[in-house]
Amino acid sequence: STSVARVMDVLAEEFNKSHTDSFIAVQGIGSTAGITMVNKGVVELGMSSRYLTESEKGEDLNVDLIAYDGLAVVINRSNTLSNLTQEQLYNIYKGKITNWKLVGGEDKPIAVVTRETSSGTRYSFESLLGLTRIIN
């Protein structure tokens, strides 16, 4: 997880200071990639900013919750719109609403920006909105 990487950088730095016989290197590569690499035995520790799917949970996998993550939707400050409903967000991300005027804003196209496919933050956001996506 790239969103967990900053916290892990600090924890790894402190661990490395007091455990000179070992070394932890942190790489934020995305939640799905981190989980997959642990399950395949490529790495010993992985980071995820989302819950694991049933297919990702292995017998030998230990999951330790270290924090809760927050999600926010932001709109450019020049946009006069002050709020969106969950249904409007759903329809924007599904491509059904493509212009701000359809949700009370100016007559301008909506440019949706999101995280990469393997992002745990994106997965959590899509799950909360009810958007479906298959993760291998």
Regions found by a protein language model. Give the residues of each.
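Flexible loop/hinge segments at secondary-structure junctions
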Residues: 1-136
